[in-house]
Amino acid sequence: MSFSNPRRRTPVTRPGTDCEHGLSLKTTMTLRKGATFHSPTSPSASSAAGDFVPPTLTRSQSAFDDVVDASRRRIAMTLNDIDEALSKASLSDKSPRPKPLRDTSLPVPRGFLEPPVVDPAMNKQEPERRVLRPRSVRRTRNHASDSGIGSSVVSTNDKAGAADSTKKPQASALTRSAASSTTAMLPSLSHRAVNRIREHTLRPLLEKPTLKEFEPIVLDVPRRIRSKEIICLRDLEKTLIFMAPEKAKSAALYLDFCLTSVRCIQATVEYLTDREQVRPGDRPYTNGYFIDLKEQIYQYGKQLAAIKEKGSLADDMDIDPSDEVRLYGGVAENGRPAELIRVKKDGTAYSMATGKIVDMTESPTPLKRSLSEQREDEEEIMRSMARRKKNATPEDVAPKKCREPGCTKEFKRPCDLTKHEKTHSRPWKCPIPTCKYHEYGWPTEKEMDRHINDKHSDAPAMYECLFKPCPYKSKRESNCKQHMEKAHGWTYVRTKTNGKKAPSQNGSTAQQTPPLANVSTPSSTPSYSVPTPPQDQVMSTDFPMYPADDDWLATYGAQPNTIDAMDLGLENLSPASAASSYEQYPPYQNGSTFIINDEDIYAAHVQIPAQLPTPEQVYTKMMPQQMPVYHVQQEPCTTVPILGEPQFSPNAQQNAVLYTPTSLREVDEGFDESYAADGADFQLFPATVDKTDVFQSLFTDMPSANLGFSQTTQPDIFNQIDWSNLDYQGFQE
C-alpha cells in the first residue's frame, strides 16, 4: 500500500482566512524547485497538486490591548497555580509529595535537549497548556511517518519509573561513618586478601565449637565484602565486635568471641597491604593498638555484664536528651586530668568515663604555680628577667621606646634604654678644649678615660707583657692580653663576648720560656728550628742525610734568595755587647714573619775569620758562615795574621782557611760540617810546628809504571807535569 507524504499534499484552503491588512500568508502560493534557486521569466499559471505549502507562522500581538490582556491572564494563571499548591500541602503528612511548583521550562525546544529524567515528579504527564489568546491555526499531525525525535525521552522515562521500584543498596550502619558518597569508587579487597581473611580469620571462628551462636555474623562477611561494605580489615574488625552483643547470651561468651576475633585479625594483618588493612586516616595496626583494643573489650564486657544483671541501666545513669555534656577539670584548672561529665537538670554531674558522681564544688589541688597562670600571664617571665615588681602595670612591662627623634628602637629593660640613649647624648666630654671630643663626647666614662690615656696623657699607663723578656707594651690592657694569647699561648678569659663564637685552641695552657738574661755567649744559646715544616722536601730514600733547603738555611742563619729586602750586612760584635743588646728580645716567636721583622733571630753573633779568601779561589761562590747546631762548649780559636797569599795546597800556608763550594752540594755524600767551632774552620797545621822537621815529602822518587803491571812500556805520566808552579821545592830536603 502506497500513499503520498501528508506534508506534500495540497493544503485545504478555507474562505475568510486572508487578513485584510495583508499580514497573513497566501496559502495558494506554491513553491517550486526551479523558482527557489532561479528567477523564472514568467510566473507559473497553475499549481500542481503535490506542491508543498508551509504552515502559517505565529505572530506576536500587534495591538497594545492584546499585550496587556495577555499579561493579566498570565498573572491570573500563576496565582491560581499557587493556590492549588497550597491547598494540597499538609503539615501533618510525613510522606514525601512531589513538588507542585516545579519549573520545567527550557530556553530551547524540549524535543532537542531533553535530559534523562531522574526525578519521578517530572515524569508525570503535563496537563494541556491553556492558551493565553486565540492563535492562528497550526496544523499538527501525528502519523506513522514521524521522524522519531523524542523517542529516547519516552524510553528514558520508562526506565526512570522502573528504577523507583528497585531497592537502593545502603551502607552498613557499622561502616557508614567511614563511608562517603564515593563508596562505589573505593577499591574493594583483592582476591588474595579475601582468601587470607577467609583462611586466618573466618575459618578459625567457624571451627571453634563454643562460638556457634556467632556463626551467622561470620557467614555474612563474604556478602558484605562483595557489596563493598567491608573494604579493609578494620571494617571486618568493627563488624565482628559491634555485632557480637546482639548474639551474645553472656558477657563471658562475648569476651571469648571478641578476643578470639582480635587474635585472628592480628594474625591476618601481616598478609595484607597497608591499603587493605585500614582506611585512609585510620590508626594503623600496631602492637599498642591491639593492647588498647583488648582493654576496651574488657571494659565493654564488664558494662555488658552489669546490664545483664540489673536488666537495665541504673536510674542515675539514665541518659536524658536535655543533659549537658561539659569538659571538666584539667591540670591547669584543678591539678587533675580533664574528663567529660554529664550534668543533669538537678545539677548532678556524672563522669562519662567511670559513671561516678563528680563533686564540682571541690576546691582545686593547691599548686605552687599552675600552668594556666604561666600561659595566661606571659609577662611574668619578662618581669622576673627585668627584676620588676610583681604587681607592675602593663605600661611598665611594655617595651620602652627611645625618645630621640627619628630613632625607632625599643628595649624591654629600662637599663638597656638608658644605655642606648647615652649614645645620642654622649654626656662624657673630653677635658681638652681643642679636642673634637670636647663637644662630641663619649657614651661611657670608660671610653673617655681610654681616649685621654691614648691621646692626651703625658705619662700614659702602659701594660707590659708578662712573659719576660718580651718587650711588648700597650696602652690598652685588652691589646696586651690579646698579644699574650697569640704570641705566648696565654689563656685569655673574656668576661663578655661580642656574639662571635670563639675558635677552639689546642694547648691553651701558657708555655713558659726560660729567660736568657744570664747567657753571655752565643754558643750557649740553643738553636730553634722553624716551626712550620718545609713544603719541598727531598726524597729520604735518595738522600737520607741531606736536609731540605728551608731547614738548612734556617738552621745556619742564611736567608733564601727570594728575600731581597733583608739587610745581609755583618757586624763584628763582641760577645759581651751582643749579649747585653739582645736581652730584650724573646728567644723565639710563633709568628710567620718573625725572620724578616727581627734584627737577629736567636740573639747570637757571628765570628768571622781575619781574612776571607777571594771569590776566584772558591769558584766565584762563598758558603755562608755556619752557626752552631749542637750545644757544645768549645774554646774560641785565635786567628793568626796571614803573612802570605792563601792557597789551597795541603803543603802551603799553615793557617789557610778551607771552604766547600756550594756548587758541589748536589754531589755531596752527606758529610756536613756541623762540628765547626764558632763559625771558624779548623787549622790544618798548628802555628808553632816546624814543617821542615816533622812533615816529609810525599815521594822521594817519581813512581814508575813497572809495578807489577803487564804493560812495561807505558810512558811516565808524571814527567808531563810542571811541578815548578806548585811551589814543590820548599818541601824537598
Curated annotation (Swiss-Prot):
Assigned GO CC terms: nucleus
Region feature Disordered, mapped onto this chain: 1-22, 34-63, 89-183, 497-533
Keyword field: Activator, DNA-binding, Metal-binding, Nucleus, Repeat, Transcription, Transcription regulation, Zinc, Zinc-finger
Compositionally biased intervals (Basic residues): 1-11, 132-142
Record's subcellular location: Nucleus
GO molecular function: DNA binding; zinc ion binding
Residue pairs linked by disulfide bridges in the UniProt entry: none
Keyword Zinc set for record: yes
Record PROSITE patterns: ZINC_FINGER_C2H2_1 (PS00028), ZINC_FINGER_C2H2_2 (PS50157)
Protein name per the record: Zinc finger transcription factor ace1
Organism of origin: Hypocrea jecorina
